[in-house]
Amino acid sequence: MGAILPLQWLYEQLNITMSEDVKHLFESIMGSSWGYLALGILAPVAEELVFRGAILRSLMAYFNYRLPWIPIVVSALLFGAVHGNMAQFANAFVMGLLLGWLYCRTHSIVLGVALHWVNNTVAYTMYKLMPEMNDGQLIDLFHGDNKLMY
């Protein structure tokens, strides 16, 4: 949440939005009975196995573990790019930096999977509990009241 809200504000200022195709994809996944399984459980495990367990670990070995920030940034950029749209890129990139740093500190994906799960679960829960936020506008978090927002 600490990165999501400021980035969402920046997206609104720059008028960066998700494409309609991506919005429809999310709505169909979130609306299905297996949506949480896919986004809340399977995605964190699969993405951590690929991006930290395989890509970051390989890059770390290539750089002989001497320059950890280069592999962390490269894997985070790939993680952001794989999310497929500018509206998710920055959030995924920042999350990828954090998860990469955690992997470098622990040499395990377990903590990364847990943090990734929490992140996706919070997003899923907000989507389900606050349908007015489904358009991604911060004003909806404050029930349309500009005074509460600023």
Model-derived regions, located:
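Membrane-embedded alpha-helical segments of multi-pass membrane proteins
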Residues: 33, 37, 90-98, 118, ...
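Hydrophobic alpha-helical transmembrane segments
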Residues: 33, 37, 69-74, 89-90, ...
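Active-site-flanking alpha-helical
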Residues: 50-59, 90, 114, 123
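C-terminal membrane module of polytopic membrane proteins
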Residues: 117-150
